[in-house]
A protein has these predicted regions:
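Acidic carboxylate motifs that coordinate Ca2+ or other divalent cations, activating on Asp/Glu
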Residues: 400
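Formylglycine-dependent sulfatase
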Residues: 1-392, 403-423, 427-434, 440-463
Length: 463
């Protein structure tokens, strides 16, 4: 079972913070049962409400591989890899899908959640540009079951309960079918607009804190279902996609000590959309009874790309041999306390300075080289001037986790690290040039916008 949180901060969980004592008992118990990691994540682009394409068909998902190997596969939540036609999750390896096809801020609702700026509710008549100009889309946010829109606009304030019920139902379905199962839960938490159980005491809990507690409760419901069905041989992998969206101010999470001070002291953000540590270091825990040592921690350098080969390895399933894989199998790290992670990881631009896909940062063990900085908005505005660094800024994270003071370019340490960075980058570019590379179609078309009933896009068929 893989659970994916959206826009969660590294400092939101499992660290001592004097100003926030958010109770997350279920995630704490998962931590105590498993092994903690920090994963580095990032994408180069995502898909729009009107996208005609999605994840290229040449690419294979781990759900497809497991499905072909006899697993019952279900997905709950955010897909965001294409919703039009054959790009739907049910055509990409999942037997069942229930969720929002993209981010929960990419459409209006009748009862908007908490966001900055505040977005208006959907209008039943003619939309006016002025009311929606600062929001992503005036099209109502859809809720899908498989390929059918069952509610539009969906009620986000009851989404947690519906996601929990759907997840529990799919676990029971796998038991009744006597199949091993893959359950992928891609949460709307902690992405804006925030929503939470109305019974949480928001007079003592800030909205973000209440939403975090809400997320913990959802994870707990799923964990209880696994226990109730006596599925002891179930691996649970909790992680996030990227750091908090700091321009959302009080509605965003905490980066912990990874503040990207070099950038913030010059204006601009250092969290989501950036390759500063706060932008792509996320809390991660993997638990598997009697297999993974409880309450343990790994400092190995890992990536979200490692999930694909590792899940298949743990399931005893081999991936297709006609391609290369960017991630590494971390089974030895999970089961045998190895700390042999990646030597280097390349981080492309994912929405801040530079062009999508530009090589922005290279991580080499505990050093990190920045070729591009700036371009991401901070709380209160200001994105910092875009800079191309040649030679790059290099930080030693073992001594400077806040990324405040780059190494002196004239130092022996800098020159040694730079040589290694150049060597690793060249090897990656050669690997890309000699491998099969797919190209996504980012074209948009109004006809591809999810709409259950033209032209108003409004329906409710939930029972």
């Amino acid at each position: 079972m893989r659970t994916f949180s959206d826009d969660i901060g590294w400092g939101d969980l499992w660290v001592k913070r004097p100003h926030n004592s958010t109770p997350t008992p279920w995630l704490d118990s998962l931590r105590d049962k498993g092994k903690r990691h920090g994963l580095r994540n990032g994408v180069t682009h995502n898909f729009a409400v009107g996208s005609v394409g999605g994840l290229p068909f040449e690419e294979i998902t781990f759900a497809q591989v497991l499905q072909d190997s006899g697993y019952y596969t279900a997905m709950i939540g955010k897909w965001h890899l294409g919703h039009n036609g054959s790009y739907s999750p049910v055509h990409r390896g999942f037997d069942y899908y229930y969720g929002i096809p993209y981010s929960n801020d990419m459409g209006c609702t009748d009862k908007p959640g908490l966001d900055l700026p505040t977005c208006p509710p959907c209008m039943h008549g003619q939309y006016t540009a002025g009311k929606h100009e600062q929001c992503y889309s005036k099209v109502a946010l859809p809720l899908f079951e498989n390929e059918t829109i069952v509610e539009q606009p969906l009620d986000t304030w009851s989404l947690k309960e519906r996601y929990a019920a759907a997840a529990v139902k799919q676990i029971k379905t796998s038991v009744s079918r006597k199949q091993p199962f893959l359950l992928y839960v891609a949460l709307a938490h902690m992405h804006v607009p925030l929503f939470h159980n109305p019974f949480f005491n928001v007079t003592t809990q800030a909205p973000y804190t209440a939403s975090l507690s809400d997320m913990d409760s959802l994870v707990g419901t799923i964990m209880e279902a696994v226990s109730t069905e006596q599925l002891e041989n179930t691996l649970i992998w909790f992680t996030g996609d990227n750091g908090p969206w700091e321009q959302k101010c009080q509605f965003s999470g905490n980066v912990g000590p990874f503040v990207g001070r070099w950038q913030t002291s010059r204006g601009g953000g250092s969290a989501k959309r950036t390759t500063w540590e706060g932008g792509h270091r996320v809390p991660t825990v993997v638990a598997w009874p009697k297999k993974i040592k409880p309450n343990s921690t790994s400092n190995a350098l890992l990536s979200g790309m490692d999930i694909f080969p590792t899940i298949l390895s743990l399931a005893g399933v081999k991936p297709p041999s006609d391609r290369r894989y960017d991630g590494m199998d971390i089974t030895d790290i999970l089961l045998n306390d190895s700390n042999s992670g990646h030597k280097s990881i390349m981080h492309p631009n994912s929405g801040a300075a530079g062009q999508f896909g530009d090589l922005q940062t290279v991580r080499l063990k505990h050093h990190k080289a920045f070729y591009i900085t700036g371009g991401s908005e901070a709380c209160g505005g200001g994105s910092g001037q875009q800079h191309y660094h040649q030679p790059p800024l290099i930080f030693d994270l073992s001594q400077d986790e806040a990324e405040e003071a780059p190494l002196n370019p004239d130092s022996d340490e800098y020159r040694f690290v730079l040589r290694e960075v150049v060597k690793e980058s060249a090897a990656l570019l050669l690997d890309i040039a000699t491998d099969k590379v797919s190209t996504a179609n980012y074209r948009t078309d109004p006809a591809a916008v999810p709409c259950c009933q033209n032209p108003i896009c409004r329906c409710h068929s939930l029972k």
